[in-house]
Amino acid sequence: VTTPVNTSPADCAWGAFDNVAPWVLDPNNIAWEKRAIELRVSAQREVPVLTTPTRTPPVARLVVVVWVLSKALIPWFVKKKLKRFDSPEESRAYISLRMRKAVERLGSTYIKLGQIISSGEGLFPAELVNEFKLCRDQVPAVPFELVKKTIETELGKPLNEVFSFIDTTALAAASIAQVHLATLISGEEVVVKVQRPTVSKLVRKDLRVMAWLAPHLVGRIKVSALANPPALVELFAETIVEELDFRIEASNMLDVAKMLRELNQDRYIIPRPHPTLATQRVLVMQRVSGFKFDDVVGMKNAGIDTHSVIRTGMIAFMEGAMIYGVFHGDLHGGNLFVMPDGRTALLDFGIVGRLTGARRMAFLRLMLNATTNNVVGQVEALRDLGALPMDTDIHAVIKDLNLGDAAIDPTTLSGEELVKEVQRIVKALMGYGARMPKELMLYVKNMVFLDGAIARLAPE
């Protein structure tokens, strides 16, 4: 099948889309867009409801969670009491391995939580971070009969009235959804993202269990970043709830596309979501392909300038956050495809960082103060981002935590040093009981990824 194309699409004037278009998006005529904006607000309002401890949690799920975690923790606790570990590092490695296996057994919600912890380099123990990086988001695919049922229920039509072809084998299967290649009746080659059955109910049930358990763990975990478990649960809920409605993801795609066009970042493109085929559990989008972001050899053999790829990536990410207040919240090698012409396609918009008004200015102040060794300015900015109450005595906090200025030369500050300076302050504050602002967590996570990408794509 040859995909119908439009080689001078009007939507490229307002969004960073490919100039070869299977369809053209009219911003005034997108069936799900207005509803998606309402859903985003609704999801944000749901977070405090899900994270406020109830008198009685979902008992059946609580029993399962406690049983699985106990099986992971008790052998470690016994070995530690009997002094069977040769070093603290061996002890941390042992418990980290057991916790990772427990997380994988508990399923989608806990796998996602493990992935957030795995992005917390400099905040969580290195053994825990490294072990949770192995947390498998690749899970067994849902049988196609269930996928077919979900698609037909969501779109309100038999499968063969929407697609002339759909691959019954998933291209990828993750904890929240799986992806299938397909071709629309009208001939366009697409990717179909389908939510796993019951995952939405499971995530919400797990969040209620976490919210009930969290207050009982305060003061019991000797890890600075886990000093305030209820705040960590709230951060996690803010991150995952929006992922459960694909109309929000489709809207995120449009917002990032608008941001990139506004900033004239023409080396990055966003796949077009279909203007009508986006529902809570199904998202149809333009198919794109290219080199994986870490396929340096493949890109160089194709004549792609990898220095340009990473340079434009850093600029687009930092400008998006600091100038426009919108940025992709989950950069990793699987979410970026470098196309044969050197442009990069961004994928998977379930998590997007948003900074508006005073919060964006506070974020900008945080970064600027980090580059100039201004600890007072950093802590004030973090307070304004919501990490601390507004009436906090900043100087008293700095004194209590012994947060002296770091020995960093602002004139030679590298990206890695900037990230470590922010991590230093945030880690100390989290040990003090502060909450990690969602946008900061996403930003630091992306900076760590991009810093590693520089080492691979432009090592010199």
Question: Model-derived features: where do they sit?
Answer:
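Conserved beta3 strand of the Hanks-type protein kinase catalytic N-lobe
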Residues: 182-183, 331
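Short acidic/polar mixed-charge low-complexity motifs
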Residues: 186-188, 343
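ATP-dependent phospho-/nucleotidyl transfer catalytic cores
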Residues: 126, 133-140, 152, 200-205, ...
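Conserved phosphate/pyrophosphate-binding and hydrolysis machinery centered on Walker-type P-loop NTPases
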Residues: 55-59, 89-96, 103-106, 118-125, ...
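Hydrophobic residue at the +6 position relative to the catalytic HRD Asp in the kinase catalytic loop
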Residues: 334-338
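N-terminal accessory/targeting segments that precede structured cores
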Residues: 1-178, 201-229
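Helix-rich C-lobe and terminal helical cap/extension of kinase-like folds
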Residues: 23-26, 44-59, 87-93, 234, ...
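Glycine-rich ATP phosphate-binding loop
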Residues: 181, 188-196
